[in-house]
């Protein structure tokens, strides 16, 4: 559930990032607008939704989060052109998967959540990065490589970084990232 919320937040940031500067057809424009609800619902309800989940309750906050995870992301994924579905956050996730033990210890949405922070840093959105970092931390999604048990060693991270910048999710972004 927690990791699903991390992946849902990414839908908003990646859709807006990858669509930046493009003239969108109707369906992609509508999908991008729906992606706003992916982030807004999780930002608004995450804390209470996690509490309800922990108590085994299906209250309003839990329901709103589940709808964002399933309905909103599904609508966005099916409405926008494929090139607007993923960007740097997912590319970072797939790079992290190459590091031994990471995929076994963390869920996809955990890694994508961390990837959002990298995307925001690369894009120079420090104010938004701070807010998202705080949100992810409150959801117990890792916000540093250290929290994932990954050494900050350039040689060790080389394959991860290479995969992150050369993967298919990086083919349609507003500027080159190397």
Where are these regions (language model features)?
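A glycine/threonine-rich phosphate-anchoring loop and its flanking beta-alpha core
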Residues: 1-34
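Generic alpha-helical structural context detector
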Residues: 7-14, 67, 94, 117-118, ...
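A short secondary-structure junction motif
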Residues: 12-20, 49, 72, 99, ...
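Active-site segments that bind and position negatively charged phosphate/pyrophosphate groups
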Residues: 24-134
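C-terminal charged capping/lid subdomain of soluble metabolic enzymes
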Residues: 125-178
């Amino acid at each position: 559930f927690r990791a699903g919320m991390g992946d849902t937040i990414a839908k908003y940031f990646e859709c807006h990032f990858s669509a930046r500067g493009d003239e969108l057809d109707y369906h992609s424009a509508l999908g991008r607008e729906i992606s706003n609800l992916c982030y807004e619902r999780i930002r608004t309800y995450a804390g209470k939704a996690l509490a309800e989940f922990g108590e085994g309750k299906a209250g309003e906050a839990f329901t709103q989060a589940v709808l964002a995870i399933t309905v909103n992301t599904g609508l966005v994924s099916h409405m926008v052109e494929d090139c607007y579905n993923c960007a740097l956050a997912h590319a970072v996730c797939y790079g992290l998967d190459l590091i031994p033990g990471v995929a076994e210890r963390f869920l996809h949405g955990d890694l994508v959540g961390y990837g959002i922070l990298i995307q925001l840093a690369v894009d120079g959105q420090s104010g938004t990065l701070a807010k998202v970092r705080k949100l992810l931390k409150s959801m117990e999604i890792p916000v540093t490589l250290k929290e994932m048990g990954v050494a900050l060693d350039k040689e060790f991270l080389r394959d991860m970084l290479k995969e992150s910048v050369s993967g298919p999710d990086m083919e349609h972004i507003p500027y080159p990232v190397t």
